[in-house]
Amino acid sequence: MLNIKKLLIASYTGCLLFMSSQVEATDIVSVNIHGNSAEAIIELPGGVSADITLEFENAVGLTAQNLGISAEVVDITSQALLQRLPSITDIAPSAAFPMMITIEPQLTSGFSFSGLATVDIHTHNLEYTAGTPLRFFKAPLNGEFKDITMTMGAGSYRARGSTGRFSQFIIVADLRPQVTVIDSKYNDLQTALNNFSADIDPAVYSALLQDLADVNQLMLLQNYSAASNKLNTFNRRISDNSGDKVPNVWRSSRDISNVAGELMAYANTLRFSLRLAN
């Protein structure tokens, strides 16, 4: 009986989510392209609004249509959403800003970019205060959300993240202990480097492994400033070898990995958390 009840609840929740996605239609006020950057101004029902800016090192075929940006008001109590977070108990989507932004270019759009993409979000629905737990999270389409925050600032609330591929974005309150966040981000970076090992020049890969081993040792000593500086070395090494030795292109056909962009993005958000802990 209990299993049947769970199935009924899951089915009912799925129906509500489907109905919500139909009713709360996206209203992108404008998408402006300027060279290697794109800005979208978004206004959704209930006065939920934001502007989001993407900056690319080099983009090909960047148009409003090719970018494939959309947004929706989400149910922040939905189990389908909450289960995509690293922790249901310590992380919660923002009730004052229940917006999820999706950037998902069509496979055949011909859009591509190289290196790192930075993503800036600004909203008047939230207020920045010192020590705020608000963070900028991203996920692959319908996948697990992770913190990508690089910087935060005032002007209501502003945050910047970086990525090597496209994603879904939300703002959450993250109440996890800082050491937990740091360990999680380090593990994500180490796992990503391991997974990309076959794509990276062996000598460069070996040097990057040593860089991360040094970062880990400094973290164990709680020398977070030195660990952050070592991550700068890690990112410079990737940047200096991007291209033939470290693949650095994302394209809409999704047939190759932007190794450089992804690794640098993981390093950037880890460095942010190390600065907070310092």
For the regions a language model picked out, list residue spans one by one:
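Bacterial N-terminal signal peptides that target proteins for export
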Residues: 2-11
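Bacterial N-terminal signal peptides
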Residues: 10-18
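Sec/Tat signal peptide C-region and signal peptidase I cleavage site
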Residues: 19-25
